[in-house]
Amino acid sequence: MVFNKESDFEEALIKILSEKGWEKEVLKNYSEKDLLQNWANILFENNRDIDRLNDYPLTNSEMQQILEQIETLRTPLKLNGFINGRSVSIVRDNPDDKLHFGKEISLKIYDRREIAAGQSRYQIVQQPKFPTKSKLLNDRRGDLMLLINGMPVIHIELKKSGIPVSQAYNQIEKYSHEGIFSGLFSLVQIFVAMEPNESVYSPIRVRTVNSIPITISIGLISIMSL
């Protein structure tokens, strides 16, 4: 199929993903702050029992504790281990939770045994917003990002028909060099560059384009189906 507009290709891919099990409600133009709140909401829903969050939502500083743990993970392997680790610990500082205030609790983040079932959530982010690290650069906006239980794990850049897929990958490389994939976005495990007739998959921080199929270790067989 020919797409003369990148936006049409983007909408078509969203439609395919939705048909394959990704949530139909698309998160549009979300910033890192928005995505953190989305993740906090999912963590709350999956951990609201008395032994965990005791039906009291996570505070901003509790989410910051999780971010700080992520920022200590310097390699893709360790970041992948975080995603697959099934749980993360925080010290409760929500004063409303008198049962756990000041105590360490463990939160369920993801269980790959629950793929397409249980408490798993699979969301699409359209045109996510990335703040740049330099005042000399404008903030960036990606094409698509895929979230599993609120965690960004796949980033997709698209080009319309007639534009080489290498240009989409070069865009990802540019974002990487600008430090876009840090903070919450450092959890991204797979980059996907696409034009309507060709797709390139690459693990994070690989500096060359390799057209090799990748089975994502968190349990997805492909980005198109759950």
Predicted features along the sequence, with ranges:
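An alpha-helical interface "stripe"
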Residues: 1-226
